[in-house]
């Protein structure tokens, strides 16, 4: 995973931040702070971001392509330009139906804790 932040004060294209790599998921960090992160991810067709559960809400924007977001057992197909908020404490994954680029934004407000 690439962790070099994007230079501040400069215009950039989200779609140009990461390239597609066959059979891979590639991530690049735009911004990383103690209060949250913004990443752009490229997902090859049929590849899946690792299933996980986050203690924070996650905003997902599909930049290009077509992807399926799974939240618990419910499927949400996304087309380019569409977005979804994955609620905190839910099992989720993202699969590229075709090659896709995704922006993921996590904002940590400080009140979240793992609920058991």
Where are these regions (language model features)?
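Structural motif
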Residues: 37, 66-68, 75, 91, ...
